[in-house]
Each structure stands twice: as structure tokens, then as C-alpha cells.
């Protein structure tokens, strides 16, 4: 109901109920509905800072003005359980570090990238469910040659049983 209320007020909001075919397949289905120039991956139970999209968009525009690659931008994140006012931990990430990214997905959330890049690599691969974002980021960044880091906590990742925010054994 909440989504339908927002959808009635803003035609840019698209909602489509689909069967659960796994995280990668469902993310691919959602990306097909997107009409914008950029995509951002977010989980259904996490929270964006109120200024997250503005800040990421501003970062893209600044990159364009400097004639730097603007295909991939990521931010810092915080983990929370009950309230974002009391984070459990913060992930203050390094600037783009390709060797480190090969070892682990330090980017996670919030990542914003060009939809044309997503389309070029074919989106997420269902056979990579569990590490689908890491696989995607490696393939996207192979094309962009790098990413820009916004050193601000813009994404709040909810920690709960069954979520990888609490540990990878949930996969």
C-alpha cells in the first residue's frame, strides 16, 4: 500500500509484483523497468540517507565537469539494528582499490552506476547468487577502469538474522 500511495503521487515510481526467482534474477527484472541513466542497488529493508541521491548525483556532475569517468560511484555505509540513530558499525571505505576489490567486496552499498554499463555486461548473473553484487562490480569496473568514492555514510544496512550484514553465513 505504501508504494502504491507514492506511485499515485509520482509517476516515476514503478511497482511490479513478480515471483521470487532469486536475488540476481529479480534485480535484473527490476533493472529492466528502470528508465534513468543510472542505477542504484538497494535492499528492501535498508535505508538511504535523505540526501543520498542528491549527493551521488552531485558527485557524478562534478566528475563530468572535470572530464573524469562518471560510470561508477560508491559511498560509505553504516550497519544498524533497530535505529539508524544508533549504528552498530560504520564502513569507511578506501578510494577505489582494484586489488583490494579482487579480494573482497568492500564497495557493497551505496553503489550507483550507468545503466548502459549494466546492459553491456548483462546485469547480474543468477549463478552468482550470494556474491552477485561483487561479481557485477568486477565486471562493471573492468569496463570503467575505476570508480569514484563519496566519503560519506549515505546507506544504512539493516542487520538481522538471514542478512549478510550480520555475516556471510546467511548466504
Task: Please tell me what each predicted stretch does.
Residues 72-108:
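Acidic/His-rich active-site region of diverse nucleotide-sugar glycosyltransferases
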Residues 1-17:
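Acidic donor-binding segment of Leloir-type glycosyltransferases
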Residues 43-47, 76:
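The conserved acidic donor/metal-binding loop of glycosyltransferases
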Residues 39:
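Short aromatic/hydrophobic "clamp" motif used to bind/position activated sugar donors
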Residues 97-171:
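Conserved nucleotide-sugar donor-binding catalytic segment
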Residues 18-34:
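Glycine-rich, basic loop-to-helix element that forms the pyrophosphate-binding segment
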Residues 35, 49-50, 114:
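GHKL-family ATP-binding catalytic core of two-component histidine kinases
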Residues 51-87:
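Conserved donor NDP-sugar-binding/catalytic core segment of glycosyltransferases
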Amino acid at each position: 500500500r505504501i508504494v502504491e500511495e507514492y506511485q499515485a503521487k509520482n509517476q516515476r515510481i514503478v511497482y511490479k509484483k513478480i515471483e521470487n526467482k532469486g536475488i540476481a534474477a529479480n534485480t535484473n527484472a527490476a533493472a529492466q523497468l528502470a528508465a534513468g541513466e543510472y542505477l542504484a542497488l538497494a535492499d528492501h529493508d535498508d535505508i538511504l540517507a535523505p540526501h543520498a541521491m542528491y549527493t551521488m548525483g552531485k558527485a557524478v556532475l562534478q566528475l563530468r565537469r572535470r572530464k573524469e569517468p562518471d560510470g561508477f560511484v560508491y559511498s560509505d555505509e553504516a550497519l544498524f539494528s533497530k535505529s539508524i540513530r544508533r549504528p552498530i558499525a560504520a564502513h569507511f571505505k578506501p578510494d577505489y582499490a582494484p586489488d583490494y576489490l579482487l579480494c573482497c567486496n568492500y564497495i557493497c552499498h551505496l553503489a550507483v552506476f550507468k545503466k548502459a554499463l549494466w546492459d553491456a555486461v548483462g546485469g547480474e548473473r543468477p549463478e552468482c547468487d550470494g556474491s552477485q553484487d561483487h561479481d557485477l562490480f568486477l565486471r562493471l569496473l573492468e569496463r570503467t577502469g575505476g570508480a569514484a568514492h563519496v566519503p560519506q555514510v549515505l546507506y544504512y544496512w539493516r542487520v538481522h538474522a538471514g542478512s549478510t550484514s550480520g555475516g556471510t553465513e546467511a548466504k
